[in-house]
C-alpha cells in the first residue's frame, strides 16, 4: 500500500487498485495529508536514497504492524488486509468543463470545452494512467472526446467513439448507455467511459443495483470520475476521484 506519488517519485511502475483512505499529520511546515491506495509493482527499478526517502524495504503484511507507530497508519493497514486484490477498474468519467449552452449557438454535441475544461483535460493523464487502461470509450460529443483525447494519446490507445453514450441518444433511449456499460462491466477489460452528468449517476446506480456496494449519491462535477473496482462478477468498491486542480 502506498501513495501513487511515492511510487512515481521512487521510479516504480505500478498498477493501482482500491483506495484505502487518508492520513493527516503535522510537520514543521504545517499539516500534511497523504492518500493511500492498494497497488501492485509492475517494474521495480534500482532505488537511490533522496531527500525524502532513505531506504525502501518490502515487508510481509503480517509483520508491518509492529513497524507502525501511528494509529491512523494501522487503520490503513487494516483496510488493506480486508480488501480483495487484483481488481479490474471500470471508470465513469464526466467530461471536463464545457462552454455553457447559453453561450453556444450550434449543435449541442459540438459544444466544446472552455479554457478551464481544456486545462482539466491536460491533467487527467497522471490521475488515470495508474489504472493500466486498455480501452477508452467516449460519447461522440466534442466535449467528451476532447476530455479523454490527452489520456488516449498518452497511453497510445485508440478512442472508441460511440453515440450510445451521448445525451442525444439518451433522450431517445435511456437503456442504450446502460447496456453499453453493462457489457464492459462484465468483461475483464480495464476500461474508461466518458459521458455526461444526466447519464452517469443513473448508470452507476443500475450497474451496482445487485451488488453489496452503495452507489455514490452525489453527482459528478466536470472532470470528476468514479472508479468501479470489480473482481470477476463482484463489485468490490467504488472510489470517487475529484477533478484535477488547475
Language-model features: where?
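Active-site-proximal alpha-helix that buttresses catalytic centers in soluble enzyme cores
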Residues: 86-173, 201, 212-224
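Generic structural signal for residues in well-ordered beta-strands
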Residues: 16-17, 56, 77, 159
Amino acid at each position: 500500500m502506498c501513495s501513487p506519488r511515492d511510487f512515481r517519485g521512487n521510479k516504480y511502475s505500478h498498477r493501482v487498485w482500491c483506495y484505502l483512505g487518508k492520513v493527516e499529520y503535522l510537520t514543521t511546515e504545517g499539516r500534511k495529508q497523504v492518500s493511500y491506495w492498494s497497488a501492485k509493482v509492475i517494474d521495480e527499478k534500482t532505488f537511490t536514497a533522496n531527500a525524502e526517502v532513505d531506504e525502501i524495504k518490502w515487508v510481509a503484511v503480517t509483520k508491518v504492524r509492529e513497524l507502525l507507530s501511528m494509529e491512523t497508519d494501522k487503520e490503513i493497514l487494516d483496510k488493506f488486509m480486508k480488501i480483495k486484490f487484483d481488481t479490474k477498474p471500470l471508470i465513469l468519467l464526466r467530461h471536463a468543463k464545457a462552454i455553457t449552452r447559453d453561450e453556444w449557438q450550434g449543435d449541442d454535441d459540438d459544444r466544446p470545452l472552455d479554457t478551464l475544461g481544456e486545462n482539466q483535460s491536460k491533467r487527467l493523464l497522471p490521475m488515470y494512467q495508474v489504472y493500466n487502461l486498455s480501452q477508452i470509450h467516449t460519447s461522440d460529443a466534442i466535449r467528451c472526446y476532447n476530455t479523454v483525447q490527452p489520456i488516449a494519446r498518452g497511453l497510445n490507445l485508440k478512442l472508441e467513439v460511440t453515440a450510445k453514450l451521448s445525451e442525444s441518444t439518451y433522450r431517445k433511449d435511456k437503456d442504450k448507455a446502460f447496456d453499453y456499460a453493462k457489457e464492459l462491466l462484465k468483461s475483464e477489460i480495464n476500461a474508461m467511459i466518458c459521458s455526461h452528468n444526466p447519464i452517469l449517476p443513473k448508470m452507476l446506480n443500475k450497474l451496482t443495483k445487485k451488488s453489496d456496494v452503495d452507489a455514490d449519491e452525489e453527482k459528478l462535477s466536470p472532470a470528476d470520475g468514479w472508479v468501479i473496482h470489480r473482481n470477476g462478477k463482484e463489485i468490490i468498491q467504488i472510489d470517487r476521484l475529484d477533478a484535477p486542480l488547475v
